C-alpha cells in the first residue's frame, strides 16, 4: 500500500491568484524580494487582496539564502504590523524567509496562529510544501536548518501556470 499525505492545500489553475481575495484573514503581510515589486508583479497579489477588502503591508527586502540580518528586519516588521497571515511571494528564499520570520516572531511574542500562504514564482525548492527552512549566518559562514511542523503551510499554496504568448 502507498500513501501520500500533505497538510498544504494546493490551489492552481486559471485565476488561482484571484482566490487571494477569499483567504480568511483581514490583515496580511506580503513578504517578497525587490524584483517582484519593481517589476510590477506585486500587482497580481495586491489587486486580489484589495478586491477582498484585505489590509496589507509589504516587506520586500528578501535576498537569496535568507541571511539572519534580513530575517531580523522581517521579524521587526511583523511585530510592528501584527498580521493575521503572511503571503510569501517568490522562490525558495522568499518562502524560507517568510517561514523563519513567522516562526521567530511567534516565539518572541507568543502571538498565536498566523496563516501562511505561498505563491511560488520558481520551481524546484519545494519550500512551499515542506516543514523546513534555511537561515544563513553570513558572518559565521553557517547555514542553519529550521525544522518544525509549524513551518508547513497549513492554508494554501497558489500556483498560476502560464504559457508563452505567441509573438506576432
For each feature predicted by the language model, list its residue ranges:
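Glycine-rich, charged/polar anion/phosphate-binding loops
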Residues: 14, 141-142, 163
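Glycine-rich beta-alpha junction loops
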Residues: 34, 123, 163
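Hydrophobic packing residues within well-ordered alpha-helices of enzyme cores
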Residues: 20, 45, 98-101, 167
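Single conserved hydrophobic/aromatic residue that forms the stacking wall/gate
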Residues: 156-168
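Short, solvent-exposed coil/turn elements at secondary-structure transition points
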Residues: 62-64, 122, 161
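ATP/NTP phosphate-donor binding region
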Residues: 1-85
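Conserved protein kinase catalytic core
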Residues: 39, 96, 126, 165-166
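Glycine/threonine-rich beta-strand-loop-alpha-helix active-site module
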Residues: 69-157
